[in-house]
Amino acid sequence: MINDVISPEFDENGRAMRRIRSFVRRQGRLTKGQQHALDNYWPVMGVEYQAEPVDITALFGRDAPTVLEIGFGMGASLVTMAGHNPQQNFLGIEVHSPGVGACLADATEAELSNLRVMCHDAVEVLENMIPDGSLDMVQLFFPDPWHKARHNKRRIVQTPFVELVRRKLKVGGVFHMATDWQPYAEHMLEVMNGISGYRNLSSDNDYVPRPDSRPLTKFELRGQRLGHGVWDLMFERKE
């Protein structure tokens, strides 16, 4: 497993260039189980980053609808979705290796063959590896809201990013976002409404009820008991 989650970029003078990232990589300690999964299951389900388009049909060994999830955390929801939808391919991206290890362990225990995982910056993966018009759905669940105003520029949902996602979706493909931070939900809606190539699937042109396709997490259930809200947004590529 190659553990460089970002690729260095240099200017014409050879100086390293800084790109605003939507994540801070806090490298937590791996449990023995997570390390075992990385050592043994990454060769089966792991996908190394490459700066050229990947053949998705070859990657999964079949031609099937493909779902990309960005930032899957510990992977519980992703594994559940892959298990419930064996007719679909699932590609998950996460920059924190403990989460990748946990996901690999759970996916192996569930005997999943339709799941692949990556440990790299999702923006670079989308820019360089994912062919245009190849994805049926892109999922972005509970991304870091970067609460402080001075950090808002770090939010992954910005106009260039959602335009990039649109290019990677098939016509009719869906970009599904969810957040438990209302100001971020409002920001997401504002950004999406500014892009002409999407159609909001909400009948009220704002948020949709949580679809059955997105499993409830323990964190979300706890939040519901405390009266916390969750906002789902689903936008379809229309052109």
Curated annotation (Swiss-Prot):
E.C. number: 2.1.1.33
PROSITE patterns: SAM_MT_TRMB (PS51625)
Ranges for region Interaction with RNA: 150-155
A Pfam family: Methyltransf_4
Protein family: Belongs to the class I-like SAM-binding methyltransferase superfamily. TrmB family.
Functional summary from the UniProt entry: Catalyzes the formation of N(7)-methylguanine at position 46 (m7G46) in tRNA.
GO CC annotation: tRNA methyltransferase complex
Disulfide bond entries: none
Binding site for S-adenosyl-L-methionine: E69, E94, D121, D144
GO molecular function: tRNA (guanine(46)-N7)-methyltransferase activity
Catalysed transformations (reactions): guanosine(46) in tRNA + S-adenosyl-L-methionine = N(7)-methylguanosine(46) in tRNA + S-adenosyl-L-homocysteine
UniProt keywords, alphabetically: Methyltransferase, S-adenosyl-L-methionine, Transferase, tRNA processing
Active site per UniProt: D144
Pathway(s) per entry: tRNA modification; N(7)-methylguanine-tRNA biosynthesis
Broadest EC class assigned to this enzyme: transferase
Protein name listed in UniProt: tRNA (guanine-N(7)-)-methyltransferase
InterPro entries per record: SAM-dependent_MTases_sf, tRNA_(Gua-N-7)_MeTrfase_Trmb, tRNA_methyltr_TrmB_bact
Record has Transferase as a keyword: yes
Assembly: Monomer.
Residues involved in substrate binding: K148, D180, T217, K218, F219, E220
